[in-house]
Amino acid sequence: LGLVGTLFSFHSIFRLGNFRKGNITFICLWLICAAMTGMYILKHTKTINQADELHWQQAYEEKYRTAYQGVAQPSVTHIQTTIDLYPNEMTYQVSGSYQLVNKTDQVIREFIVHTWQDIQMQSLRSSNLSQIKMDRAFGQYVIKPAKPLMPKDSFSLHFTFRYSVNPWNGHNPANAIVQNGSFIRLSNYFPRIGYQSELEITDESERAKRTMPAATSIKGLTDAMEQPYPYGFIRWEALVSAPAEQTVVGIGELVKRYRKNDRTYFHFDSKRPIPFRFGLSSAVYEVKKTQHDSIAIEIYYHPRHAQNVTHLMERIKQ
């Protein structure tokens, strides 16, 4: 409607003979502003259609599947990370380190690390590197340790990345950093070791059109686990900071909570190995607490969403 109204105004100016110097200046300024606004939106909008995504998936698979699927890669055994949440700016910052172990019976001379294109990868480094190559098109790093990793050898890998919400590309519910109610499935965005079969095209007819071989099969619930499983289980330690008024709920035992420089810090430690699946939420919560068989139980909830809290507490005790 705004565009129609503007065009009608332009038509009226010309039709009624109100074509003065001031009108010309106004029209020129309006056109310049419209062009600059359009360019800004285009620059910040990720315009990837389905065809582009399918081409990307095919290219990734063709480049990395044969070369790295089934090839010995190190396993993540321990993650230490610091995560700073800035919900008012809709952004968060992560620094972390992986302890990698060669759990195979083969020598590992190089391995690959996949990073996600939604995040801003800032660094990937180690003191034990001879070479690192980045494939920017696929967010892929090819890493060669200074010395080949013999069976049971370990390797430390350090990384930093940042994520900021792009208002032009919609809301991702698994990566939501918002003012009061953040939820981040962190394991979706941390670097991954090895070939990522979940990035393959899964539609059989689409693969047939592209003359691609069968996709990597998904293991059933009763299938034997790959040994060693690519991630097995990990020890997880995280220091998470958030605005002072917010509470962070995360994976592991809350070892310590303290305030510093108008922010609240939460130190989580899994204490024992957990699957490579971890996340957190942060908001201003109400808390309902109780003790049951010497076990502390706490439920964090939005003050206006308390309808089933008592029922939930009773179910937990059972």
How would you name each of these model-derived features?
Residues Q57, T160-R277:
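Extended, low-hydrophobicity, Ser/Thr/Pro/Gly-biased non-transmembrane segments
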Residues Q99-D105, T115:
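Asparagine-centered strand-capping/turn motif at beta-strand->loop junctions
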Residues T91-Y92, Q106-I108:
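Short acidic/proline- and small/hydrophobic-mixed sequence motifs that coincide with surface turns
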Residues I119-N180, A224-P228, D262:
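A surface-exposed beta-strand-loop module
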Residues L1, R15-T91, A208-M212, E226-P230:
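N-terminal, polar/Ser/Thr-rich
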Residues E110-D118:
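Aromatic-lined ligand-binding clefts that engage carbohydrates, nucleic acids, or primary amines
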Residues L1-S12:
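Membrane-embedded alpha-helical segments of integral membrane proteins
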Residues V94, Y141, H158, A238, ...:
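Juxtacatalytic substrate-recognition/specificity segment
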